[in-house]
From Swiss-Prot:
It is found in: Nucleus. The gene is TFB3. This is RNA polymerase II transcription factor B subunit 3. It comes from Debaryomyces hansenii (strain ATCC 36239 / CBS 767 / BCRC 21394 / JCM 1990 / NBRC 0083 / IGC 2968) (Yeast). It comes from the Eukaryota. Residues 124-206 form a coiled coil. Signal peptide: none annotated.
């Protein structure tokens, strides 16, 4: 792979055409060697069939149908992405295919070793032979796995399309209700004007108030109707879509069996208690009433009398509680037990 400098980045190394003079020029690369060639040179050199790479000292046989547009500026990243796509298409097992997590981790490690060797040119022939051998031995399993994944992707695409239609239906209902509300307001306004033209001046305020109340009642009623309609649409969507049912079942299962290494963000039943006087009294009174049932910390006691610390919200109990938390947190944490 050739390292490019900034000056030759926008110039074809074969025909020396510059992108400044030809703004529509596109560069193509071939996964065989990842040398950058402009599109016109590819058409000129490889239209009649396979030909060697025009780069000096390369000589790899390239085919026109293998050329593609460069996506990443760094060709090293481009090469690694292509290798990962190829290897993941062959080693396409997931965690569901393994009974033990350790076996799955070993499988992932072996896949990463293959990618690393191919990307860095380490034992290329041996790695390629092992890759081809595995593909030939597990061809049926690979095809079955690809079919299952394509089915999942198809279900996901259908689910996304249904979600889009659901949103469109909600927007359509909302717009229709807004149009009807505007028509109702115009009708109320016209009726109010007709009544005011024939009513006495004493009754005009009552008519205006009554009209405003009717509009408010109508608005609140329409909001409730809109909420009911949207909830009905959501229920119909959830009941008719199998993908959403599966996602909801997985979510419910995750909610039923939570796992956190420290039992959540707090312990409801702590393994320690404050001494009675410290727990009840304020931080300023702890040291004055210190006795047998208290714990006296000379340094912290001085800070408890400092107005600068107290003004910032610091309290002596907070310091004691933090020290005890650091001492006791995690002592009763058994990860294997929590997982089960």
């Amino acid at each position: 792979m050739v390292v490019e400098d900034d000056r030759s980045k926008d110039m074809c190394p074969i025909c020396k055409t510059d992108k400044y003079l030809s703004p529509n020029m596109n560069f193509l690369i071939n996964p065989e060697c990842y040398h950058k060639i402009c599109e016109s040179c590819v058409d000129r050199i490889f239209s009649l069939g396979p030909a060697p790479c025009p780069y000096p000292k390369c000589g790899k046989i390239l085919r026109k149908n293998k050329f593609k547009k460069q996506i990443f500026d760094d060709l090293g990243i481009e090469k690694e992405i292509d290798i990962r796509k190829r290897v993941s298409g062959i080693y396409n097992k997931t965690e569901e295919d393994f009974d033990d997590l350790k076996d799955y981790n070993k499988y992932l490690e072996s896949v990463e070793n293959i990618i690393f060797n191919l990307n860095n040119g380490i034992d290329i022939e041996e790695t390629e032979s092992n890759l081809v051998k595995y593909e030939n031995e597990h061809k049926i399993e690979i095809l079955e796995k690809n079919m299952r994944e394509s089915q999942k992707n198809s279900d996901l695409a259908k689910y996304q399309e249904a979600m889009a239609r659901l949103k469109q239906e909600k927007v359509k209902i909302q717009k229709q209700m807004e149009i009807e509300d505007l028509e109702f307001q115009k009708q109320q306004k016209q009726e109010l004007l007709d009544k005011l033209s024939t009513a006495q001046s004493a009754n005009s305020e009552e008519l205006i108030t009554q009209s405003n109340n009717n509009i408010l009642k109508r608005s609140s009623l329409r909001k409730r109707q809109l909420q009911q309609l949207t909830s009905q649409l959501d229920q119909q969507f959830q009941s008719s879509n199998p993908f959403s049912k599966q996602a909801k079942a997985i979510e419910d299962e995750d909610n039923r069996t939570p796992f956190t290494p420290f039992k959540g963000d707090r312990e409801l039943h702590k393994n320690y208690t404050f001494l009675p006087d410290i727990h009840k009294n304020d931080a300023m009174d702890v040291d004055e009433d210190a006795g047998l049932n208290t714990y006296h910390a000379p340094y912290l006691s001085k800070l408890a009398k400092d107005k600068q610390y107290l003004g910032a919200g610091w309290r002596l109990n907070n310091a004691f509680e933090r020290a005890l938390d650091e001492a006791f947190t995690g002592l009763c944490c058994f990860i294997d037990k929590e997982k089960t």
